[in-house]
Amino acid sequence: MLKVQTEKGKIYSFIRDKWLVCTPEEEVRQNLVCWLVNECGYPLENMMEEYKNQYSDGRGVRKTRADIVIFRTREEKEKNYNAYIVVECKAENVKIRKEDFYQGTEYAQNLRAQFLILHNSRETNFYAIDMDKIPNKDDAFTQIVGIPNYSDIYDEKKVEDIKNKTKIFTREEFTSLLLRCHNIIRNNDKLSPEAAFDEISKILFIKIDFERRFKGTQVFTLDQFVKQEADYERFTRPTMRKQGIDKSYMQVLFDNTKLAYENDHLFEENEMIKIRENSFKSILTLLEKYNLSDTSDDVKGIAFEQFLGRTFRGELGQFFTPRTVVDFMTEILDPQEGELICDPCCGSGGFLIKAFDYVKEKIESDIQAQKDRFKTQLMSKHPEEMTEDQQIELNAQIDRVFKQLNSELEHVHGEKGDYYSRLDNLSYRSIYGTDANPRMARTSKMNMIMHGDGHGGVHHHDGLININGIFENHFDVILTNPPFGANVGKDQTIDEDDLERDEKRIAYYTDLYGTPYKKQLDDLKRRAQGLTVNGEKKDKERLLLNLYETGKMSTLTEVLFIERCLRLLKPGGRMGIVLPEGVLNNSNLQKVREYFEGKAKLILICSIPQDVFIKAGATVKPSLVFMKKFTDEEEKQYRSVVRKARNTVDAKYAPEIKELNDAYERKEIKHKSVYNSKLKEIETKKQEEMKPLIKKGFDYPVPIAKVDKAGITTTGGECDNELKDVLLEFRMYNTENPLWHKSTPNWDYSMNDDLRIIRSDNTNTVFLEE
C-alpha cells in the first residue's frame, strides 16, 4: 500500500520515481496518487504527471502540463493514445468550482478522456465526459459520484452505471435512505412520525459533527462506533459510574454534538437519545456510505427537505410549504444581494432556504463574471503564442486571482477579524425567521445547516412579537405561509419570557442595527411590564392584540400576520404571503381589506388549487398574495386622495348634517340616541361614498392569475406546473411596468500591480483574502 513520503522538505513522486520540493500543491497531488492506487487499483505504470499538452483557446496555441493523466494500459500510454482519466489538483481548501479548473476541462477535452477528476485539499469532484457534446462543456461534463475501479474499466455495464450515477441519483438515494432510517425507528421504537424525525436529526448531526472533526477524512461507520463503544465500556464508563454518572456511549456522542452546536440552539440542554441501540446501529449501517462532511450542500439539503416533506403530514403538515409554491413566490419577489429577508412563520425553513440559495446564485454569477473579466485582463498582457514557462506564469497569476475572488464565496468571518465575505453577509446579516413551534424552529435551523448555513437569524419565538434582528420597518422582502384559521386570544399577553435575555445577543444586534433596534427593544420591555408611554401602569398595554390595528377588527392569525408583515417591511418593501381565499372575499373581513389597501399596493394575486396543500392537511382554498408597502411618496399620495375624497363627501353632506343639528337644537329630535343614530347613518353613507372616490383617485392595475395545476397533486406527486407560465408573464409585465425599485449591490472590484484584488463599495475598501 502506498503512503505519502516526506523527508527534509521533499516529497516522493511515485509516478516519476524521484524526490520533489514539498509544496502544498505537490502534497495534494501525491495524496491523490496514493488514493488512486490503494483504493481504485490503478497501476503507477499507467499514469503520468506533468503530462505535456497543448490546446487552443481562440487566441492561439497554449502549451501547458496536466497534473495527472491515467491511461487504460501502459502500452496506450507509451503510444500516446487517448487518456482514460485526467486529473487537475489545487492546494486551496475551498469548495470546488468547475469553472476555476478551466485547464483541467481543456486537458480532458483535448486528450479525449472519459473521466475528469478535480481535486483540492478540501474535496474531490468527479465528472463523466461525453465527447459528442464537446465543446459545450456545460452539457459534456456531468458530475458523478466516483470513477470505475481499475478492475472494472473493461466492464461496459459497470462503467455505464457509474456514468449514470449522477448527483441527482445520489440525492434521491439519500432521501430514500433517510425514509428507511425513519421507518426503522417507527417500527423498532414505536415513536410518532414527528418524534422519529427528531431522533433521525440527532443521528445525522452526530454523524456530521464526527466527520467535521476529522475534516472529512473519516466516515462515521458502524465498525468505528462498535470499537469506540468497547473502549468506552472498558475504560471510561466504570470510572463515570463511580462518580454517579451513567450514560450509554450513544448518549455521550449526542452530548458532544449538543456541545458542538450549543450556539445554534438545535437541542435542549437535557435532551436525550430516545431510541434503542439496535436502531442506532441499523441506521449507522445505512448511512455509513455517506461522508456528510464531504457531501455537497445541495445533495444534503434537498434530500433533507424532501425527507421533511414526506414526514410532516397531518398536524405538522401546516409547517411545510410545497417547493413549487416556495420557488414561485421567491422568484416573483426576486430578492437581491444586500436586501434583508424574513419569514415570521418560517416552519421548516423552505422560504428562507430558497431565498438564501436564490441570492447565493446571484453572488456566484457575479464572481464568475469578475473571474472572466480579470482572466481576460491578464491574458491580454501576454503574447498570443506563449512559451511553456510563460503559460505556467499566466496560469499561476489566474489561479491567484481566482483564489482571492473565491474568498467571497467562503465563510471567513471569525477567522479574519472584521472582514465579511459576500457569503458571510448573506448568511449572517440577511436571512431572518421565527416560529412559535419549538420543533419547527429547530427543524428550520437544521434544514438551513444542511443547505449550507444562513441559520443564525432563525429564532424560536412568537412571530407576532419583535426579537433580535426581527423588528418593524426593517426588511426589504417578506415571504411567509402563516397559520390559517387560528385565533389570538383576547387575553394573550406579552410577557417577560418574550424578551431576549442574552446580553451578548442584545449587544450584537445593538451594534449591528443601532437606535432603531434599541428603540423597539425598549418599547417591548415597556409593554411586557404593562406600562404606557408615559410610564402609567395599565395592564391592557400587555395585550398582544393591542399591538395591531387589525386586532380591533379580527383575531384571526392570518389577518394579524398580514399586518405584521407590512409592519416588518421598510417603505417600498415587498411581501408574498399564502392566504385562505376568504381573506380576499369574505364580507365580514371587508374592513380588514380596506385597512391593507391603505397601507400597500397589491402587485399580484394568484389563485392556486386546493390540491397543493391537501397533503399538508389544509382544508381551504389558498391564494398567493403579493403586496408592496407604500413608499413615503405613495403614502403622501394616498393620504392626499383620502383627504380630497373626504372633503368632497363632507361638502355633499354638510347641508344634511346642518339640518340635523338644527333640528336637534330646536328639539324636534327629542332623544340624543335618535340624533346619534341618524348622525351615524350619515357617517356610514359618507364612508361608503368615499371608497369609490379613493379607488378612482388612487387607481392602479392589479395582475390576477388563476392556475389549475401548481406542480403538486393531492398525494404529493408531481404534475404540470402552470405557475411557471405565470412567472414568465409577470416578469414581462414587471419589466414593462416596474412595480418596485430594484436595488443592485454596489460592489466594485479592481486589481493592483501586485495582483491583489480590491473590493470597494460606498463605505469600505478591503483587500480580498489570499
Locate the predicted segments by residue.
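A short, conserved, highly charged catalytic patch centered on acidic carboxylates
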Residues: M1-F115, E123-D161
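Short amphipathic alpha-helical segments and their helix-coil junctions
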Residues: T6-D17, R171-L191, S282-E288
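Structural motif
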Residues: C22-E27, R186-S201, K274, S293-S296, ...
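A conserved structural/catalytic subdomain of Rossmann-like adenosyl-cofactor enzymes
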Residues: K95, P148-D152, E472, V477-E770
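Non-catalytic accessory regions of SAM-dependent methyltransferases
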Residues: D152-K215
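Class I SAM-dependent transferase core
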Residues: I184-I185, V299-T324, T330-I332
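Long recognition/docking surfaces used for binding and targeting
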Residues: F205, R212-G309
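Conserved S-adenosyl-L-methionine
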Residues: F319-T480, F484-D502, P580-E581, V592, ...
